[in-house]
């Protein structure tokens, strides 16, 4: 169920401060964050945000299409290695 419109988007304050500083300085370095739950705001467009996936920080270049989504949607936490091969098909 989506968040109520009267509450507005959620973003961690420490991440918002880092984004504001990066926009102000026109900094090209990735902004490192562990906050996967924060929503992508229009002021983040064009920034590279390094989102933690539980093991490492995955760089995510924010585009216009990503606004309104959560940061965690773009940094996969699980590694898919494929299903086991069918033993009958090998013969």
Swiss-Prot record:
<keyword id="KW-0689">Ribosomal protein</keyword>
<protein>
    <recommendedName>
        <fullName>Small ribosomal subunit protein uS19</fullName>
    </recommendedName>
</protein>
<keyword id="KW-0694">RNA-binding</keyword>
<dbReference type="Pfam" id="PF00203">
    <property type="entry name" value="Ribosomal_S19"/>
</dbReference>
<keyword id="KW-0687">Ribonucleoprotein</keyword>
<dbReference type="InterPro" id="IPR005732">
    <property type="entry name" value="Ribosomal_uS19_bac-type"/>
</dbReference>
<dbReference type="InterPro" id="IPR002222">
    <property type="entry name" value="Ribosomal_uS19"/>
</dbReference>
<dbReference type="InterPro" id="IPR020934">
    <property type="entry name" value="Ribosomal_uS19_CS"/>
</dbReference>
<comment type="function">
    <text>Protein S19 forms a complex with S13 that binds strongly to the 16S ribosomal RNA.</text>
</comment>
<dbReference type="GO" id="GO:0003735">
    <property type="term" value="F:structural constituent of ribosome"/>
</dbReference>
<keyword id="KW-0699">rRNA-binding</keyword>
<dbReference type="GO" id="GO:0000028">
    <property type="term" value="P:ribosomal small subunit assembly"/>
</dbReference>
<comment type="similarity">
    <text>Belongs to the universal ribosomal protein uS19 family.</text>
</comment>
<dbReference type="InterPro" id="IPR023575">
    <property type="entry name" value="Ribosomal_uS19_SF"/>
</dbReference>
<dbReference type="GO" id="GO:0015935">
    <property type="term" value="C:small ribosomal subunit"/>
</dbReference>
<dbReference type="GO" id="GO:0019843">
    <property type="term" value="F:rRNA binding"/>
</dbReference>
<dbReference type="GO" id="GO:0006412">
    <property type="term" value="P:translation"/>
</dbReference>
<dbReference type="GO" id="GO:0005737">
    <property type="term" value="C:cytoplasm"/>
</dbReference>
């Amino acid at each position: 169920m989506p968040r109520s419109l009267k509450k507005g988007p959620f973003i961690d304050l420490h991440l918002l401060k880092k984004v504001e500083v990066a926009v102000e300085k026109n900094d090209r370095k990735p902004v490192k964050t562990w906050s996967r739950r924060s929503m992508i705001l229009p002021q983040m467009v064009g920034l590279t945000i390094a989102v933690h996936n539980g093991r490492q920080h995955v760089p995510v270049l924010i585009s216009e299409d990503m606004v309104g989504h959560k940061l965690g949607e773009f940094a996969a936490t699980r590694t898919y290695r494929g299903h086991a091969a069918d033993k009958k098909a090998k013969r």
